[in-house]
Amino acid sequence: MKLAIIGGDGIGPEVVAQAVKILDVVLPGVQKTTYDLGARRYHTTGELLPESVLAELREHDAILLGAVGDPSVPSGVLERGLLLRLRFELDHHINLRPARLYPGVNSLLAGKPDIDFVVVREGTEGPYTGTGGAIRVGTPNEVATEVSVNTAFGVRRVVQDAFERARQRRKHLTLVHKNNVLTYAGTLWCRIVQEVGEKYPDVEVVYQHIDAATIYLVTEPSRFDVIVTDNLFGDIITDLAAAVCGGIALAASGNIDATRTNPSMFEPVHGSAPDIAGQGIADPTAAIMSLALLLAHLGEDEPAARLDQAVASYLATRGNGRFSTGEVGERIAAAL
C-alpha cells in the first residue's frame, strides 16, 4: 500500500501523526510519503497544489489528510485551491460520513438514542461547481445566481454506491431532497433512485424532504440506515449528524472515487483549530477513525475492524478524563 499523508494546517499534522502511529501498529509496512501542503507552503512559495505534486498524489492508493485552513490566509483560498481542487481533480464524487453514537459517548439528545447510519453525499456537483454569477454588483438592483448542477451520470453513480452500502447494512435507504420545490433536480434524483432500486429488491427505499429529515435526525435517528443526498443537503445534515453523535471531534469522513481510478482521501471533519495548535491537546480520535475508513476502502477489512473496535473500547472507558493528543493515541494503540 502506498499512502500519501498531508498534515495540512493547525492541528492537522498533530492528529495525523497519531493516526500514522496507529497505522504502524495495525498494519506495519505501509509505504508512506508526506507532502507539505497548506498555509506554510503558500506563504513560502505562493503555491497551493502544484501540478507536479498532484501527479505524485495520483500514484498513491489513498490520501490521509489532517485539516486545511489558517487565519493568515484569506478565507476560501486554501479551501478552494487545495481541498476542493483535490476533490474535483481526483473525482471524489462520494463524500462518505458515518454517524454512530458509541457507548460511553454522550449525545445532546435525551436518553440513550440508537444512532448508527451513514450518509452518502454527492461530492462534485450541486451548487458547489461554481456555476453562477452576479450583475449590477453593489447597486440596489444587484442580482446573484448560484446554479445547482445535477447530471444523470453523477447522480446515478452515487445512488449505486448508496444501494450497495445499504445491502451490506440493514437494507434500508432514505433519499433526502426537496423535490416539491426543487422540481427539476428532485425529479432526476427520485427517478434514478427508483431505477437503480429495481436492481435491489431487498433494499427498502423511502423518501424524505430535507426539512423533515433534520427533524427525524433529532427526534428519531434510529430510523436511518443509509441516507443518499446531494452535495448541499449532505453538507448540512452530516454536521447535524455529527452533533448528535458526540460532536465533530468524533466525526470521520471519506472523499471517494468509487471507480478507484484515483486515490480516495480520508480526513477528520473538524477544522484546523489554530487556536489550540501546538499545545498537544487536540483530539486525534476522528483522524484515527478516518484511518479505519481508509483501510476498509482499500480492502483491509480485518485491520479496519480491529481499529474500529479499539476506538470503541477507548471511548467506552475514557470517562470524563482529559487526555493529551499523544495519550489518546497511546490508549487506542494499547486497545489494539
Curated annotation (Swiss-Prot):
Listed InterPro entries: ICDH/IPMDH, IsoCit/isopropylmalate_DH_CS, IsoPropMal-DH-like_dom, LeuB_actb
GO molecular function, one term: magnesium ion binding
Oligomer status and interactors: Homodimer.
Cofactor(s) listed in the protein's UniProt record: Mg(2+); Mn(2+)
NCBIfam families: PRK03437.1
Protein name per the record: 3-isopropylmalate dehydrogenase
The family this protein is said to belong to: Belongs to the isocitrate and isopropylmalate dehydrogenases family. LeuB type 2 subfamily.
Binding site for NAD(+): 271-283
Binding residues annotated for Mg(2+), in chain numbering: 211, 235, 239
Subcellular compartments: Cytoplasm
Superkingdom of origin organism: Bacteria
Cofactor binding annotation: Binds 1 Mg(2+) or Mn(2+) ion per subunit.
Claim: Manganese is one of the keywords in the record: yes
Catalytic activity: (2R,3S)-3-isopropylmalate + NAD(+) = 4-methyl-2-oxopentanoate + CO2 + NADH
Entry EC number(s): 1.1.1.85
Gene Ontology annotations for the cellular component aspect, listed alphabetically: cytoplasm
Biological pathway: Amino-acid biosynthesis; L-leucine biosynthesis; L-leucine from 3-methyl-2-oxobutanoate: step 3/4
Signal peptide boundaries: none
Organism ancestry: Bacteria, Bacillati, Actinomycetota, Actinomycetes, Mycobacteriales
